[in-house]
């Protein structure tokens, strides 16, 4: 995180993956090596000297009210991060220009109140209220959730959120993202902690050639049922692929490297 702080002109996110334990391990070994999302969050608080606390984090599905109000306003289905609450967490932090200390989003913005507003207004639009007047009301109220005295210099959070809500574009999201540093983590499961409720709410899937949708933590955690069996059934050699497609694999690789600016 400190490395990212020193390079925030090019680094805008740090994502942690608490280790998944594989192979034969006794209970003592598992307890020794096991680290969970709450463990990581606690250690981040300790290692940032309390600049980023455990209270600054939100489970991933907390962003659903924002998705809901944008979906209601646009009348188009949107991608939903509606995964199980235990799958991951995230927060946004900014840097104080004078002290160089981190200022988490929660320190100057009432996120809980803002999310409640989004959910309430999404329901109003769905129930038939004029969506344009409703969204104007949302944008008008955004400033009330931001403590401008604590807000980092050069940041206008209410304006950026308003742009995201009204423009709903990658550019509007990008202008927000480059101003801060996203911290996130997602704990992929293993055979010692596989949770069926988490699998049922998975947001990262594999689509197999036989048109099955398999949750990530089932596909990779139980490979003898899914990954290995599927790959064995459908994999082909490079030579077979080249003959079928009528191209050389190395030619495609070369073109890909050229597009990325390689020599």
Located regions from the model:
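Conserved C-terminal portion of the radical SAM core fold
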Residues: 1-66, 82-91, 96-98, 211
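Extended, Lys/Arg-enriched charged tracts that mediate electrostatic binding to polyanionic substrates
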Residues: 67-74
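Radical SAM enzyme core and accessory elements
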Residues: 75-263
């Amino acid at each position: 995180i400190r490395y990212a702080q020193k390079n925030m002109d090019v680094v805008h996110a740090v994502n942690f993956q608490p280790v998944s334990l594989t192979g034969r391990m006794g209970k003592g070994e598992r307890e020794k090596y096991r680290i969970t999302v709450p463990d990581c969050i606690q250690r981040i608080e300790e290692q940032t000297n309390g600049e980023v606390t455990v209270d600054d984090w939100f489970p991933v599905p907390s962003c659903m009210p924002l998705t809901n109000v944008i979906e209601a306003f646009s009348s188009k289905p949107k991608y939903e991060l509606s995964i199980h609450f235990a799958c991951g967490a995230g927060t946004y932090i900014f840097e104080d220009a004078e002290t160089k200390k981190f200022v988490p989003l929660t320190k100057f913005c009432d996120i809980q109140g803002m999310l409640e507003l989004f959910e309430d207004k999404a329901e109003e639009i769905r129930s038939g209220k004029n969506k344009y007047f409703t969204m104007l009301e949302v944008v008008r109220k955004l400033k009330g959730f931001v403590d401008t005295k604590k807000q980092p210099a050069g940041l206008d959070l209410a304006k950026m959120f308003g742009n995201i809500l009204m423009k709903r574009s990658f550019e509007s999201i990008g202008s927000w993202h480059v101003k801060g540093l996203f911290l996130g983590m997602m704990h992929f499961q293993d055979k010692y902690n596989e949770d069926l409720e988490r699998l049922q709410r998975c947001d990262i899937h594999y689509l197999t050639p036989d048109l099955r949708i398999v949750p990530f933590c089932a596909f990779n955690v139980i490979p003898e049922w899914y990954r290995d069996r599927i790959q064995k059934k459908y994999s082909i050699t490079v030579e077979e692929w080249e003959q079928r497609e009528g191209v050389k694999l190395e030619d495609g690789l070369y073109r890909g490297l050229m597009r990325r600016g390689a020599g």
